[in-house]
Amino acid sequence: MKEEMIQRFTSYVKVDTQSDADKESCPSTEGQLNLARQLVEEMKSIGIQEVTMDENGYVMGTIPSNTDKDVPTIGFLAHIDTATDFTGKNVKPQLHENYQGGDITLNEDLHIVLSPTQFPNLQKYQGHTLITTDGTTLLGADNKAGIAEIMTAMHYLIEHPEIKHGKIRVAFTPDEEIGRGPHKFDVEAFGASYAYTIDGGPLGELQYESFNAAGAKVSIKGNNVHPGTAKDKMVSAAKIGMLFHNKLPSDESPEYTEGYEGFFHLTKFVGEVEEAELQYIIRDFDKDKFNDRKALFEKIASDLKAIYGENSINLKIQDQYYNMREKIEPVKHIVDIAHEAMENRSVTPVIEPIRGGTDGSQLSYKGLPTPNIFTGGENFHGKYEFISVENMVKATEVIVEIARLFEEKA
């Protein structure tokens, strides 16, 4: 299973599948379709049935039930795209067998080193086979590790019919990293009662709580006048943007928050005298606090309009997804089964909130309760991303065990 996992994963990461928030198409990039087509052929070759890919790049397939019991149909999902935070073009995965601790040189020429001094968790992986980048790209374990783990698990179930299970559906989705993964996902066609995204981080992660999330765009109009004659005439849009931002609590940003704490995050600020634009993401686990955060944006905009004019500021806030806990708690047994599956495979479950979102956040509100399970990777979205092959195998074992437990408990 280990060699099969390495071959699959390294094949997937070499395909550039970064999504693009500036594109309106679905998927947003051609590279995602390239990998989707590759997955379709591979799924057929290993015996997955009813394999489909629609015009939007959503790939689905079926492992038929092999039991007489009436077992709920379950699904496993991963996303095809990789993050936009760092380049994902020409990924060159590096294999480090039997890691012995200490620094890992990713790129000698560029002096890029993955060090436990900077990333203390690295020391936990002594004896593991690690896959890293070459220091010039991200790796793409988020979420190609999930794809590899699902594919390997499905292949294992097909090759081992003695493991009884109900009907299983798998899906690989585009554009998760830009928040659109479930937008065109056909829940009815997928036909599962419950599902799991394989999109978490380190070994044991089991998550059924996510942020409530919104995006905000603040567009500001100023008035540019020659600075030599600007007194009482010039209005600097850039300065108004600074005023707007400084009215937000300075300690409620990502670098100062953890656990269940929410935040405001300024992701982009471009400005000059004539016009400026600020883009934010707004996050909180608590629905009331989430609404309070959005209300604060409205108040700041209103206060500044009172000073600079009604047309000086245009604020747009759009909800992106909600805390999936509300939809999963009524069917908490699906979390309990994942918890038991991990313990059965000698994995210690680590239940914690997702300080982010997954496709499951939105799918849960579309009628498909979908908690999230670990992939085994760390340091996603950057050049220091790495993953343990042994922990990828554990994720595959947990997927197989979840399928077995649903049949056993039916």
Curated annotation (Swiss-Prot):
Signal peptide: none annotated. Zn(2+) 1 binds at H79, D142, D199. InterPro entries: ArgE/DapE_CS, Bact_exopeptidase_dim_dom, Peptidase_M20, Peptidase_M20_dimer, Peptidase_M20B. Binds 2 Zn(2+) ions per subunit. It is found in: Cytoplasm. The active site is at D81, E176. One of its GO terms (molecular function) is zinc ion binding. GO terms for biological process: peptide catabolic process; proteolysis. Its cofactor is Zn(2+). The keyword Zinc applies. SUPFAM superfamilies: Bacterial exopeptidase dimerisation domain, Zn-dependent exopeptidases. It catalyses: Release of the N-terminal residue from a tripeptide. Disulfide bonds: none annotated. Zn(2+) 2 binds at D142, E177, H381. Its EC number is 3.4.11.4. Keywords: Aminopeptidase, Cytoplasm, Hydrolase, Metal-binding, Metalloprotease, Protease, Zinc. Gene3D superfamilies: 3.30.70.360, Zn peptidases (3.40.630.10). One of its GO terms (cellular component) is cytosol. Its main location: cytoplasm. NCBIfam families: peptidase-T (TIGR01882), PRK05469.1 (NF003976), PRK13381.1 (NF009920). Cleaves the N-terminal amino acid of tripeptides. Belongs to the peptidase M20B family. HAMAP family: Aminopeptidase_M20. This is Peptidase T. It comes from Bacillus pumilus (strain SAFR-032). The lineage of its organism: Bacteria, Bacillati, Bacillota, Bacilli, Bacillales. The gene is pepT.
